[in-house]
């Protein structure tokens, strides 16, 4: 009986996992509108922190983040760029097949309504217009210079900033984003084994 239950659990888990991956393979289908305010919980190898998102700060960013968290995109993602006194960045999926589908799934830029103060979370972008996709960063300190270059925060850490502060930082900016995108978690696990990562991210309310 126990064996049958265990087998059923494995089948259900496998089916759920395949369903989640299937959803993440189609960015254009994940366009649910986020609530005016919501909380996302991040369970990581460093501990737990919570993000309170304010959709009116940056609607495009808030909607994208909501869909990514809700559909498990950030689960397993490493904190690959950690610069003490500046930011901690994450959001490249560990599965290259999924990552490829999101590289061109950009969202429009929007005005900076809330400053990049300590504990705020913001989508990363390049110098090109409308280049935000999945990568986000949390500000370790007040980074007002980012306000002038169009980085629009969409939320803030409401608990667990002490956890964010202790995310492993010794590798700095050494992990190569291009290799993470093409090789995924395998590259990071082999070359940067001490990186902290997200075990599970969920929408709480």
State where each predicted segment sits.
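Sec-dependent signal peptide recognition
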Residues: 1-7
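A ubiquitous, low-specificity "background" feature that marks scattered single residues
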Residues: 8-9, 141
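Hydrophobic h-region of N-terminal signal peptides that target proteins for export
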Residues: 9-17
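Cyclophilin-like peptidyl-prolyl cis-trans isomerases
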Residues: 16-205
